[in-house]
Design a protein with these regions (language model features):
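Active-site metal-coordination segments of metallo-dependent hydrolases
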Residues: 16-27, 65-78
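Membrane-helix interface segments
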Residues: 43-45, 96
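An active-site-proximal "capping" alpha-helix that borders the catalytic cofactor pocket
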Residues: 28-31, 73-89
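His-Asp-centered metal-binding catalytic motifs of divalent-metal-dependent phosphohydrolases/nucleases
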Residues: 46-68, 79, 101-108, 125
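Mid-chain, well-packed structural core segment of small domains
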Residues: 86-92, 98-106
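Short alpha-helical hairpin
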Residues: 1-10, 53-59
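Divalent metal-dependent phosphate-bond-processing catalytic cores, especially two-metal-ion Mg2+/Mn2+ enzymes
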Residues: 2, 13-26, 30-42, 55, ...
């Protein structure tokens, strides 16, 4: 089976030199990995989380070409089938690929969170999006209070944004 590093390298190549996309996925992966480890995830859940974090925006290049934007709904719609194809030769099990595809296909739908891997992916992506887009303190505080559930995600958010 491919390692996380090999999947990361493959995703960087897939990103075709888009430095913003590569930096974003790298940052989301870093936060997801950190939160997952601090929360004590089992090895398989941690692996699935990290693969999902690396590939969560896999549909962005296609969405830019097809729709002219990277709207979250389009990302979810296009991302699940793309990630299945992307992961087909990694040696991951069908169950692992199914879960990653589910996470990628729902990563803009926090109301549907159904597991710790999904929760952490949402938290990690939010931290990075808030940083990249300069979300105001109140928006960050509101998200933290209403959507964040992990102690590690809340601690990191408080530390990063001073809320």
């Amino acid at each position: 089976m491919m390692t996380i590093a090999q999947i990361m390298e493959k995703m960087i190549a897939f990103s075709e030199g888009n430095v913003h996309d590569i930096t974003h996925l790298s940052c989301v992966w870093t936060y997801a990995k950190t939160i997952g480890e601090l929360e004590g995830l089992d090895a398989d859940t941690q692996f699935i989380l990290e693969v999902a974090a690396i590939t969560h925006d896999i549909a962005c290049p296609l969405c830019r070409k097809k729709y002219g934007n990277t709207n979250g709904k389009y990302q979810e719609q296009e991302g699940a089938p793309l990630v299945r194809e992307f992961l087909a030769d990694t040696g991951m099990t069908a169950v692992q690929i199914d879960r990653v595809a589910y996470l990628v296909g729902h990563h803009h739908s926090p109301a549907q969170i159904d597991g710790i891997d999904y929760q952490i992916l949402i938290e990690a992506d939010y931290i990075v999006n808030a940083s990249e887009s300069g979300y105001d303190q109140q928006a960050i505080r509101t998200f933290m209070e209403h959507t964040m559930k992990t102690a590690a995600g809340i601690r990191l958010t408080k530390t990063v944004f001073g809320v």
